[in-house]
Amino acid sequence: MKHFCLALLVISSVMRANAAVIVVPPDYNSGGEPISGPFSQFSTPPNITSMRYQEVYASDQFSGINHGGGFITGVGYAIIGGGGLQPGGVIPKLQIDLSTTSKGPDGLSTVFAENVGADNRIVVGPKPVYIAANTPGDPTGFGVFIRFDTPFFYDPAQGNLLMDVRNIEAPGFVQSAGSFAGLNKSGDSISSVFAFNVGDATGIRDTIGMTTAFVVEPIPEPSTITLLTLALPLIFFAVRRKRQPTN
């Protein structure tokens, strides 16, 4: 039993050590500003019932991922300037895709399809998604947290990261705890293209983007694999010993 507990402790410590939160752009507190994005109450003007929003993130912002890439399991957003708004609301039908793209910040095409990479994967939905501050499991400082249904493998060495959001059935008023933290600065690590109709093939290009906290599970480094290799035999030995009949 002692060996079994020790092995579990080693494995759990390794997993906790591997988890990382990468914020893009990291300097949003200096010169940042509130923006609406595709999730908040200001996303859709009156009589507009859907939206498509793409945002690109420069690959050099993901240096915190070990060599070889990692799995993105969720995204967090910071709410700023609450202004007495409601605590949250449900977007009836939301879909989020991620892909690796050759397009860079301030270089997105106004044609949505031209920005999408070959490894495109649906990571959320399409389904109802609750958007509110202080979501359980949120990264510190980023209260709106969306956990992915399917992780996305991303290797920064292969290109920039594209997030593609389809707000398919957005009501005219989506409650929110406030505006989202973002950055509207040419030459930074993010930019976007958007349209107020999810079916539009083209959109409006803008240098603005939402500050995003990515939760990443990197591929274990060789030292981590060594620890796991040592721990697994301990578990096997403990389980086998426990099953042996006592005289």
For each feature predicted by the language model, list its residue ranges.
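Sec-dependent N-terminal signal peptides
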Residues: 4-12, 229-231
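Hydrophobic h-region of N-terminal signal peptides that target proteins for export
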Residues: 9-17, 235-237
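Boundary/junction segments of secreted and surface-exposed precursor proteins
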Residues: 17-48
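Proprotein-processing/basic-patch segments
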Residues: 22-28, 157-218
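A short beta-strand element within beta-rich, extracytoplasmic domains
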Residues: 70-82, 163
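Aromatic- and Gly/Pro-enriched, solvent-exposed loop/edge beta-strand patches characteristic
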Residues: 85-186
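A short, hydrophobic C-terminal helix/tail in secreted or cell-surface proteins
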Residues: 221-239
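C-terminal membrane-anchoring or membrane-association module
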Residues: 237-247
